Structures are given as C-alpha cells and as structure tokens.
C-alpha cells in the first residue's frame, strides 16, 4: 500500500496481547474487504490488469530502509493508486496483496515472519480497499474536479496505511503513537504527493492513449527509488547515532 502503495515492515520484537488483538482486528477488516470485493466482482480488465500487477510486483522489490524507524518503504504506491483509479475493487486488492506479499520477502533471501506478513497484507488490503471505495463511490465524482476523488482516495490510503503501522510499532516498542506517526508522516508524505501526481497524469493519458501508459511509470519509480536510497543512506547513520545517544543517556 507503499507504500508501502508507501509500505512499512517492522520487526515484531515482543508480541504483546494488545498487539495481537490489533493485528487480529486489522486482519478481520481485511477479510471483510475481500468478501465485499467478491460481491462487487466485475470482469477483469485483461492486459491492463496484468500489466499493473506485474509492475507493482517489480516495484515492491525496490525497498528502502527508513531512517529512525524499524521499517522500510517500497515504490509501489503509484501502481496501487493506478489500480484504485482504473480497475475494480477486486483487481485493486489482488494487485495490493501480490505486491505486498512480494515486499515481505527479505532481499537477503531470509524467510518472512508470518505474523508480520499477515499484518502487512491486511493493512494493504484495508487501505487500498477503502481508497477504491472512496474513489468509485464518492458523491463528489462528476460534481467537482475529476482530480478530487483521487486526492481523497490517496489521503484515505495514506491514513489507512500509516496509522495501523504507527499503532503496531507503538504497541510493540512502547513508543508514543503520535510520535511514531509524525515520523512516518515526515518521511512518507512527499512520496504520497508525488505518487498522486504521477497517478493523475497516467489516468488522464490512459484515456487518450490506452492501457500501455502505466508501463512508462516503472523507469520513473526506479529513478525515485535510487534518489531515496541515496538520501536515506546518508540520513540512516545519523538516525542510528541519535538513537544510540538517546539510549546511552537513558542508561545513566
């Protein structure tokens, strides 16, 4: 969902009862969203669906470690938003789940953690599902500028992804919720703004040219991935040094 669609994947150090309850709640919401998508199922969009699915899966492997947070971000968000805007709810959920599942596998070939995978998949399903419902069912569609439903859907995806991530980090690491969410907001908000801009251009061009337009987004996202990697690579040592200094100060 980035996120991820910004998408984060922290390590659950100590799974508290509260964290387990929250993960169960998010998973239940995701199951409900999937069931709802089955009830609203429409014919697949064929090549357009397959192309966005493939692009989202490839983009999911372009992961960046976030400085100061126990998590990472992939550059698959524009493809989530393209799915939200141009495909059905069921198709958007399939793309989000496949891309997020791909993101869950560590680059070093290690095994993913099942509880973490469940949480990440559930969060992505809820976020993208809500975004799709907001976009397609908004009463503002056709009344206001055509870009407003996309902005509303992106804001929904942003909140539905970042708030659960901040909550689970708060529950597992004992850090204040608003402090965690503020850090996530500062790191990921520009990426969401960029993603909604890219999606707006793609959806407009697709009406004139065709479904092939999303294919041009992957090189752009790779360039963004490289830029973020360089920027966060410089910021990460500083964040680690700050965390160590705080830990040393707390020990005295």
Placement of each model-derived feature along the sequence:
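Short helix-perturbing small/polar motifs within transmembrane alpha-helices
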Residues: 2-72, 80-229
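Membrane-proximal helical linkers
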Residues: 175-180, 231-252
């Amino acid at each position: 969902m980035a996120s991820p669609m910004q998408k984060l994947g922290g390590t659950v150090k100590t799974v508290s009862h509260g964290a387990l309850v929250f993960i169960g709640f998010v998973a239940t919401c995701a199951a409900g969203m999937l069931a709802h998508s089955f009830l609203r199922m429409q014919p697949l969009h064929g090549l357009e669906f397959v192309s966005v699915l493939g692009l989202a899966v490839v983009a999911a492997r372009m992961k960046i470690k976030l400085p100061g947070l126990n998590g990472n971000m992939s550059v698959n968000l524009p493809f989530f938003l393209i799915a939200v805007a141009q495909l059905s709810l069921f198709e958007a959920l399939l793309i989000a789940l496949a891309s997020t599942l791909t993101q869950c596998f560590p680059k070093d070939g290690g095994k993913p953690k099942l509880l973490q995978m469940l949480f990440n998949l559930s969060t992505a399903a809820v976020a993208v599902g809500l975004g799709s419902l907001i976009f397609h069912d908004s009463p503002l569609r056709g009344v206001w500028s055509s870009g407003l439903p996309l902005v509303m859907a992106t804001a929904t995806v942003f909140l539905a992804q970042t708030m659960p991530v901040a909550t689970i980090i708060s529950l597992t690491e004992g850090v204040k919720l608003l402090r965690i969410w503020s850090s996530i907001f500062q790191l990921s908000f520009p990426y969401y703004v960029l993603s909604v801009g890219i999606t707006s251009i793609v959806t407009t061009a697709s009406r004139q040219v065709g479904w092939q337009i999303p294919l041009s987004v992957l090189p752009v996202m790779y360039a963004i991935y490289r830029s973020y990697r360089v920027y966060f690579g410089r910021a990460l040592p500083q964040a680690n040094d700050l965390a160590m200094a705080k830990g040393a100060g707390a020990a005295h």
